[in-house]
Structure formats: structure tokens, C-alpha cells
Amino acid sequence: MASVSALTEELESVASELHAIDIQIQELTERRQELLQRKSVLTGKIKQYLEDSSAEASSDLDTSPAAWNKEDFPWFGKVKDVLQNVFKLQKFRPLQLETINVTMARKDIFLVMPTGGGKSLCYQLPALCSDGFTLVICPLISLMEDQLMVLKQLGISATMLNASSSKEHVKWVHAEMVNKNSQLKLIYVTPEKIAKSKMFMSRLEKAYEAGRLTGAAVDEVHCCSQWGHDFRPDYKALGILKRQFPNASLMGLTATATNHVLKDVQKILCVGKCLTFTASFNRPNLFYEVRQKPSSAEDFTEDIVKLINGRYKGQSGIIYCFSQKDSEQITISLQKLGIHAGTYHANMEPEDKTKVHTQWSANELQVVVATVAFGMGIDKPDVRFVIHHSMSKSMENYYQESGRAGRDDSRADCILYYGFGDIFRISSMVVMENVGQQKLYEMVSYCQNVSKCRRVLIAQHFDEVWNADACNKMCDNCCKDVSFEKKNVTQHCRDLIKILKQAEGLNEKLTPLKLIDAWMGKGAAKLRVAGVVAPALPREDLERIVAHALLQQYLKEDYSFTAYATISYLKVGPRACLLSNEAHAVTMQVKKSAQSSVRGALSEARQVEQVDSKGEEQSSGNSQKSKSRLQPSGSKNAGAKKRKLDDA
């Protein structure tokens, strides 16, 4: 009869195998769920495309851009005359003529066009070719000021109404709205004016009845949708325009809306049949680059000053910052070093914002250091650089902000400084937003990627297929003349989980910085875990691993709300249980270390091949010393050369 100890040993073996099977089942279940979700998305898209195709086939409304790219419409002569003699342009950009023709035909349209593609002309030119005026809804005062400044230079009669408009000005605009002899062609308002001013709506009704309101243009139309990156509640009230003024054409414009957002916007604006024209997201003249953010403020400022005084000497640019405080401090630092810089943020007085905007537009200031308030609609053509002092809170925001560079179609640079701490600063700010954290993590994933073409990453986000070869080496990743490999970081992730579990047992919460300190053997001794050896890697590499573990859900954020701040802590994530399975692997793609010679590189390649084929450790004098280094994925070689996990 078997001894109790033997039975116990077998029982433990069975229990261990069952546990491994449970983990595999969980992994398969998670994968199944991912595939089901993807299946649902694809099925929905196919259904939507079929419905759209059916609707197009049964409708007399020709929805293809090619059908509107014609010069035989009765209004074309006037359109061409205004283009050349008023706007001083000789030809249209892609989709401009098509959109203008649709608007002149009094059809509703949504236009998705990249920043700098010339969206404004699509409603400004038809306004000049029509009787009456066009109402333009914009989310920001700076946007309206910029548009009006350009229109004034062109001799076009346009104005705006906002909270700071004088009574005399409001009275004059209201009178012009119903005056049949008025030359006023464009009236800019914020969405709040539509949502909250009964007097203005009353005047709009009278203008519509008199045949004076010919159309409305909703700029940054993605703001209508709570699924958009910049949702604004007052935009939801804009559905009143189509209900009250059904015969006035409506145009929605955006640079960043996905198909899902556009469908939502269409419902919110009460638009039935409409055309949707989408231009390619690609701006071929923009160079995209992600840089590691220097750890000290002094080094960071010095890095930016070298760029401005070197590569961008005498050239115009924008620096985007996370907070108003950052923008003010950086402006002061730049000014002390002789850079002509000005601050721009939402809490400045209107006249101060206008002054900075005007000085920058006239090249009296070289750089505007701004928050997102210096945003939508900024239309200076010769911006040669846009630097992000911190990453944006979403890919949509980044695409729009970086797109303010190079609107003259000459080369311009979009440089983003990526810092680990910024993830959690921004996360604490967007935690209350509907999909704020999800969108932030998409941005972090973009920054973490060291190998894939930046344009491919942007295209994937906006539901567009892009061939990396067409980038023409206009991004940092496509310019790299290096090879990449997958590094196994599974043990590092296991160590992080051990540290977090011990802290939880001690009723301690760990911020991301405290977690890394504990991992490196620094900070409070009680937070260190026996058996967890401090990795022999630079701190920025450890930060990348933590960020990767967060994106892959081995870690998760937890928030604590105080009277003065929202604090982000890290906890064990939903996928951490998978790490207890020895077969489970977590990998990161990193740049291969430079080899001293081709011979050395070939030798190392042969070593890796031997490890992969034999599946056993190779002898090495450095075996013990390099255990904490990242190993190539799938390799058990503990004696591989020490390598630094390289960022771009």
C-alpha cells in the first residue's frame, strides 16, 4: 500500500497540474472573449457597409466624391472666381471642390479631413457664393479669432458673437441677420450661444424665415459625441438647427472622428440622409518623432533650447504642455535664455490671449507655449515644429495638435517627449471621463512602440490601412537602421506582482514611483521582497516594463481622491494570475544592442540559434551576473550578454 507521503506528493502534483490547466482555460477564455468581441465589431461593420451601400443604391443622392468632382455645375463659374480673386488660390485641395459642390446643392455633409487640409474653405467659399449668411459653430474663441483675422485680411465681411461681445455689437449683428442688403457673410458663435441664448435663436428663426440663413457649419463636430475625444455637452443642443431650419444645409467638419463617432454625431444633429467624405489622414510633409523625456527640468529645457536655436533658428513653432503651470514656467525659462516665447492657456484674460496669438501670427513671437486651449482652428501656415512637452491625453488630441505644423506643405517636425510620470499625471486628470483611460493608454502604446511606422500606428487608430513603405522615412521608427528582437520580461512582471502583493498585505498603497523604488531596492525596507533581486537595468528601462505591464493588464491603476488631488496607485491587474503559469510569457520588442563587429553579431546569432534549437542553457562565465537582464523571448540562456533595453 502506498505511503501517505507518496499519495500526498501525487495529490500535490495533480493539484499543480489542475492549477496549470485552470490558467490555460482562463487564457483561452480570455482569448475567446477577445475574438468574440472582434467578431462582433467586424459583423457590425459589414452590416453597416451593406446598409450604406443599399441606401446609396436606392437613393437619388449620389454619395461618391467622384460624382461631385465636376466643373459643369451652374455655380462653378462663380466658385472659381471667388477662389482665385477673393481667396487668392489657384486650385482646390483634395475633396474641397466636391464638398463645396455638395454645399452649393444644399445637401448635408460630414467632412473628415486632416488638420491643415483646408476644411474652412469648404464653408467659407459657398457662403460668399450664396445670398444671406452662413452660421459657423466653433468650440473655442481662439479658433474664431484666427478665422476672422484671415477673413478680414481677405476683405470678407464676417463677425463673431461670444460672452464678451458688447451690447452694441450684439445689436448690430442681430440687425444684420435680417437685413436683406447686408454684406455680412459669416457669423461665428460658440455652441453655448445656440444652447443658452433664446434671443439669438429667436433672431435666427427670423433670419431663416426671411431667407437669410442659407447654411450652418459645425466645426470640430466630433465634440457632439461622448465617444469623441473632446466631448462638450453644449454640442448636444445643436440638433435644434436641423429641426428648426430643415432647408438650411448643414456641414459637419472634423479631423479626427472614427466611423463610430460619426454615426453617433449624425443622430445627435438630427441629420437623416447626408454625404460623408473622408480624406486620408496622412500628412506626408510631417516628420513624427518620440523622444525620451529627460529626468531633470534643466536638461529638458536645455534640450528644447538647442532645438529652437539650432534646427529651428528663426522659425515658428508651438510647444504643448500638460498644465497651465507648466506652460508659464517653460515660457519663463525660454525667455531667460533669449527665446521670444509667449504663454497661452484658458485662464488668461481674453485680450492677453488675443495679443499672444496676434504677435505669434505676425512672427513677433517665435514660440507659443500653450495648453490645449491654443487649439482647434489655429491656421498659421509656416509652423515648422510642434513639440509636445508631455504627451497628449489621446491619439485624437495628438493628431490634431501635431497637425498644426506644416500647413504650407513644407517639411515640419512633430516631436513628442514621452515621460513615465506623465502617464499617471494625465490618468488622474481623465479618470472621470467616459473613455479617458482607454484613450490615454492608446497614446501610451504609441509612445512605447519603438519599431512600427508612426503613420501605421496613427492609421490603425483612425480605421485606415497604411503601407509603411509609403512613409518615405518621415518618422523616427522608419529611419532606424537597426534590428529588433523580443525580450522576455516575464520574471520582471512576476517580481512586480510579488512587491504589490506584499504591500497589499501590509495595507500599503504604492504609487508607480514607489513601486519602481521598491523594485530597485530603494525606499522603505518593508516594501522590498526577499528573493526579488534589483534588475541591473537603467531606471527608464524599468519604467518601460512597468508601462508595458500596465498596458497588458498585469497591473492596473487605482485612484485615491483627496480634497486637492487625485492620486494614482498601482495594483495587481486582472491578468496577473496568468503569470503563475510557467508556460506563460510576457515579451517586449526592443532594439538589438550594437555589436562591435559583424563577426560578433554572427557569433551571437549562432549562439541564440543553438539555444532555440537545443532548448538548453549555454555555458557562460557571466551566468550568475546577468540573471536580472532581459533575455531573448523563448531562450533559457542565462549567460547572454548584458544589454540595455533600448528606447527610440
Swiss-Prot record:
Cofactor(s) of this protein: Mg(2+); Mn(2+); Zn(2+)
SMART domains: DEXDc, HELICc
Matches recorded under InterPro entries: DEAD/DEAH_box_helicase_dom (IPR011545), DNA_helicase_ATP-dep_RecQ (IPR004589), Helicase_ATP-bd (IPR014001), Helicase_C-like (IPR001650), P-loop_NTPase (IPR027417), RecQ_Zn-bd (IPR032284), WH-like_DNA-bd_sf (IPR036388)
Biased composition regions of type Basic and acidic residues, renumbered to the chain: 606-617
Family matches, as SUPFAM superfamilies: P-loop containing nucleoside triphosphate hydrolases
Key words, A-Z: Acetylation, ATP-binding, DNA-binding, Helicase, Hydrolase, Isomerase, Metal-binding, Nucleotide-binding, Nucleus, Phosphoprotein, Zinc
Phosphoprotein among keywords: yes
Motif DEVH box: where in chain: 219-222
Residues holding Zn(2+): C453, C471, C475, C478
Family assignment from sequence similarity: Belongs to the helicase family. RecQ subfamily.
Oligomeric and partner information: May form homodimers or higher order oligomers. Interacts with EXO1. Interacts with MLH1. Interacts with PARP1.
Full protein name: ATP-dependent DNA helicase Q1
